[in-house]
UniProtKB/Swiss-Prot annotation:
PANTHER family: ADENYLOSUCCINATE LYASE (PTHR43172), ADENYLOSUCCINATE LYASE C-TERMINAL DOMAIN-CONTAINING PROTEIN (PTHR43172:SF2). SMART domains: ADSL_C. GO terms for cellular component: cytosol; nucleus. Its EC number is 4.1.1.113. Its main location: cytoplasm. The gene is TAD1. Keywords: Cytoplasm, Lyase, Nucleus. This is Trans-aconitate decarboxylase 1. It comes from Mycosarcoma maydis.
Length: 493
């Protein structure tokens, strides 16, 4: 996890704070809306102290809590309670059975040691919960639990619920990143710097333009998130093979009522072995963290000692070396890169999970259980680090100007070429300026001086015109207009 920013005198944004380790996951419960009892999801244990030393570097307490055994089982129980309620309303099971089942759908009643033993024995994580629920209900009323459902109905729907909780956190951090980029694009819209192509200086741009390009990309991720939510937040309830045969002519009615109670979209048809929804989440996380890694790469390169144009927020000892006291490593960007690389591999695994056989599969389904929690934690960590960096990013305009001047005018050679193009022809002007650039580089002289010595060029453009063309500030193109275009378009937040 990125630290709180509390010691950076250059920060212009509101003071940062890291996500609190004591944060309690807020989860809505359908049972609070149901008559006759409530499913209690409060009081989940704080899992932050049980994690390893690196856990808050490659994850966050909030995301770990979402993907914990306790929260997963809480989702199972919420689904089982909702199923009992809707089936009682439809007359499929007795109302007193539904009430009894709901009363015992509480994580506090789970024997975790027994559950672990049963899960390892059975190989699937739902039956052990159902067995305990049946046993905890009086008068045999628990026998109506899990009526017409199959294990995958519960696990897939619970996974969808956990994804919804997770993407709520993702959206919060993504929105904060977008806000920071909006601020940086506007604040630095007129700060000139060198664009780089193949790691070489290309032409002048502004730092605000560079930030606006990132802003546009992260806004596209906001759009993708909105779009995928419509497809992903969907109920899975199809019974043994998807056709709900065990519920007779009330199968689809049960499905639709259950979806409504869980605040999920009803599926158009069962999807036990059609895992495109989970794969879409994985590829979205891959795209998002890929952009975070690109951002981290640029910041790392721009913070090199020889460049020094930006720096991560300064906090004493953060990114320090055990051997070199002068070091202030871009440690947040380092971890963003590591998280993104892992998410990409996870996305590939979720695509593998799509290759499931027939109506109920033999294996690829379980890939999702392993990869999604890891991917969500890596994504959350990458987002937190990026949010921290952008909200306190140190920007050094003097260094940007210094680097613009390093080439002694070579960076505006395109401007000179275009200025000569109308009289000499573009290609001829290109070759003439190329030779002048080579001479200026070899002799370590200003390009302007070499251009003035070239009789052909000097005959077409006088000194005043060449001086204007050789000033990087005069060759910023449409940077400001592009920034205006991006900032004028509303965020998808």
């Amino acid at each position: 996890m990125a630290p709180a920013l509390n010691a950076n005198p250059t920060t212009k944004r509101d003071e940062l704070s890291a996500p609190s380790a004591s944060h309690k996951l807020g989860m809505s419960s359908m049972a609070s809306r149901a008559a006759g009892g409530g499913l209690k999801l409060t009081g989940l244990p704080d899992l932050s102290d049980s994690a390893g030393t690196l856990s808050d570097i490659f994850g966050t307490p909030q995301m770990r809590e979402i993907w914990s055994d306790q929260n997963r089982v809480a989702c199972y129980l919420e689904i089982e309670a909702a199923l009992a309620i809707v089936q009682a309303d439809l007359g499929i099971i007795p109302k007193n059975a539904a009430h009894e089942i709901v009363e015992h759908c509480r994580v506090q009643e789970i024997d975790w040691a027994l559950y672990k033993q049963k899960t390892e024995l059975i190989g699937y994580p739902v039956l052990g919960i159902v067995q305990q629920l049946v046993a905890n209900c009086k008068d045999g009323l628990g026998e109506y639990c899990h009526w017409g459902a199959t294990t995958q109905d519960i696990t897939d729907t619970a996974t969808v619920m956990q994804i919804r909780q997770s993407l709520t956190l993702v959206k919060q951090r993504l929105d904060s990143i977008v806000s920071s980029l909006e601020h940086l694009a506007e604040q630095h819209r007129n700060v000139p710097m060198a664009a780089r192509s193949n790691l070489k200086q290309a032409v002048p741009i502004t730092f605000g333009f560079k930030m606006a390009r990132f802003l546009a990309t992260f806004r596209r991720h906001q759009q993708r998130l909105v779009e995928l939510e419509k497809r992903v937040y969907t109920l899975e309830f199809g019974g043994a093979a998807g056709n709900l045969s065990s519920l007779g002519d009330q199968g689809i009615a049960t499905h639709d009522a259950l979806a409504k109670m869980l605040d999920l979209a009803p599926a158009e048809i069962a999807w036990h072995t059609e895992h495109d929804r989970f794969a879409e989440v994985g590829t979205f996380l891959g795209l998002l963290t890929g952009t975070l890694a690109k951002l981290a790469t640029d910041i790392k390169l721009m913070s090199q000692t020889e460049v020094g144009e930006v720096g991560e927020p300064f906090i004493s000892n953060r990114g320090s070396s055990s051997t070199m006291p002068q070091k202030n490593n871009p440690i947040s960007c380092v971890y963003i890169h590591a998280c993104a690389a892992n998410v990409r591999q996870g996305a590939a695994a979720l695509l593998d999970a799509m290759q499931s056989d027939h109506e109920r599969g033999t294996g690829p389904w379980e890939i999702i259980w392993v990869q999604l929690p890891l991917m969500m934690n890596w994504t959350s960590a990458a987002l937190n680090n990026a949010d921290f960096v952008l909200r306190g990013l140190q920007v050094f305009p003097d260094a940007m100007q210094h680097n613009l001047d390093l080439s002694k005018g070579l960076i505006v050679s395109e401007a000179v070429m275009m200025g000569l193009g109308n009289t000499l022809g573009r290609q001829y002007a290109h070759d003439a300026v190329y030779e002048c650039c080579r001479t200026a580089f070899v002799q370590d002289r200003p390009l302007l001086d070499v251009l003035l010595e070239n009789h052909e060029i000097a005959s077409k453009l006088d000194r005043t015109e060449l001086e204007k063309l050789c000033d990087p500030a005069n060759y910023l193109g449409q940077c400001s207009q592009w920034i205006d275009r991006v900032l004028s378009r509303p965020s998808s937040a």
